[in-house]
Design a protein with these regions (language model features):
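Aromatic- and histidine-enriched alpha-helix N-cap/loop-to-helix transition segments
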Residues: 109-117, 130, 177-188, 205-208
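Extracellular/oxidizing-compartment recognition motifs
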Residues: 1, 11-108, 116-117, 131-136, ...
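Carboxylate/His-rich catalytic cores and anion/metal-binding grooves
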Residues: 118-144, 206-211
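Extracytoplasmic/secreted proteins, especially bacterial periplasmic and envelope-associated proteins
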Residues: 82-86, 90, 120, 137, ...
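Short, intrinsically disordered, charge-balanced linker/junction segments flanking boundaries
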Residues: 4-10, 195, 199-200, 208-211
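Well-ordered alpha-helical scaffold segments within catalytic/enzyme domains
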Residues: 53, 120-131, 186-202
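Alpha-helical hydrophobic/aromatic positions enriched in membrane-embedded helices and signal peptides
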Residues: 2-3, 191
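HEAT/HEAT-like alpha-solenoid repeats
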Residues: 143-147, 195
């Protein structure tokens, strides 16, 4: 089924967008209380469906661990309008759910390091979270991903100096491969960092890539 805005709360959507079946399997010993969690991956979701549980399952029997980088929260927003407050809360959850090794664009699909979010969402994130160290790391990764002459030759093209739209760039995705909103992050993100924090060192680090 397609995702429908009118879908009822609690309705689990199981369709695989890319026809990739992802499954965590755990065989219980059956000798007492057991706990398990994935060790090499994480999953984004809104609802969890449990099938085959013997007896009555209560919410306190399932623990959901929320994962994100440790960016300290220093900004808040609150009004007398509960709708605006709710929108702010939903937005904040969307932001924090994508703060990992890179700034991903969704926590439930491919979890790639799309770099356009690093500048398009910079102010929205920096107003609420201290992202100085985290964003420095992302800028370093963006600069480090630029193709040098040897890498361009190995790729069979003449794209020396090209900055991929995702980091690490292990494959290309259609028309986004050469879009300034994505590839231009090597310019826009360091500039946004400098404008917000006044750190010239970030500009000096990124300048050889920009040039």
């Amino acid at each position: 089924r397609d995702v429908a805005p009118s879908r009822g709360l609690g309705d689990v959507y199981k369709r695989q967008k890319f026809d990739c079946v992802i499954r965590d399997s755990y065989r219980m010993a059956g000798t007492g209380e057991e706990r398990w969690h994935p060790s090499f991956c994480y999953h984004g979701f809104q609802y969890v469906e449990v099938v085959g549980f013997p007896g009555e399952l209560t919410s306190d029997q399932i623990i959901c661990c929320r994962l994100a980088v440790a960016n300290e929260k220093h900004g808040t927003f609150e009004t007398s309008n509960q709708t605006l407050n709710r929108i702010c809360e939903i937005t904040d959850r969307s932001i924090s759910s994508n703060m990992y090794w890179s700034f991903t664009d969704c926590p439930q699909i491919e979890k790639l390091g799309w770099i356009e979010t690093s500048h398009l969402m910079f102010a929205s994130v920096a107003d609420v979270y201290d992202i100085r160290a985290w964003m420095k790391k992302i800028i370093h990764d963006i600069c480090d991903s630029q193709l040098d002459n040897e890498q361009a030759s190995l790729a069979g093209n003449n794209e020396e100096g090209f900055v991929p739209g995702i980091i690490p760039a292990f494959y290309r995705i259609g028309g986004l491969y050469k879009d300034p909103n994505w590839n231009g992050a090597c310019v826009f993100t360091p500039w946004a960092y400098y404008q917000y924090y006044g750190d010239e060192a970030v500009l000096r680090q990124a300048f050889p890539v920009i040039e």
